[in-house]
Amino acid sequence: MPKSEIHPKWYPDAKVICNGEVVMTTGSTQPELHVDVWSGNHPFFTGTQKILDTEGRVDRFMKKYGMGSANSSESKDQKEEKDSKK
């Protein structure tokens, strides 16, 4: 026989609240769930996603740490070696 009163109380109509407004209902062990982000206001789901320019960030990193000229000279040397072997 299972023990009585060991399980939490279940709320089948728990309210999910975001920015002071009820956005949905669900089952939970708490009567109200307060969330900061949900699919209705998240940029990924609303289509207002900001895409970062990663190429510009890589170039800025290479320039900052002086790797841009080192990589380009190595690639030229490698090309010359390949051409001389042929």
From Swiss-Prot:
One of its GO terms (cellular component) is ribonucleoprotein complex. This is Large ribosomal subunit protein bL31. Keywords: Ribonucleoprotein, Ribosomal protein, RNA-binding, rRNA-binding. Residues 64-86 are annotated as: Disordered. The lineage of its organism: Bacteria, Bacillati, Cyanobacteriota, Cyanophyceae, Synechococcales. Residues 74-86 have a biased composition (Basic and acidic residues). It comes from the Bacteria. Binds the 23S rRNA. GO terms for biological process: translation. SUPFAM superfamilies: L28p-like. GO terms for molecular function: rRNA binding; structural constituent of ribosome. Part of the 50S ribosomal subunit. PANTHER family: 50S RIBOSOMAL PROTEIN L31, CHLOROPLASTIC, LARGE RIBOSOMAL SUBUNIT PROTEIN BL31C.
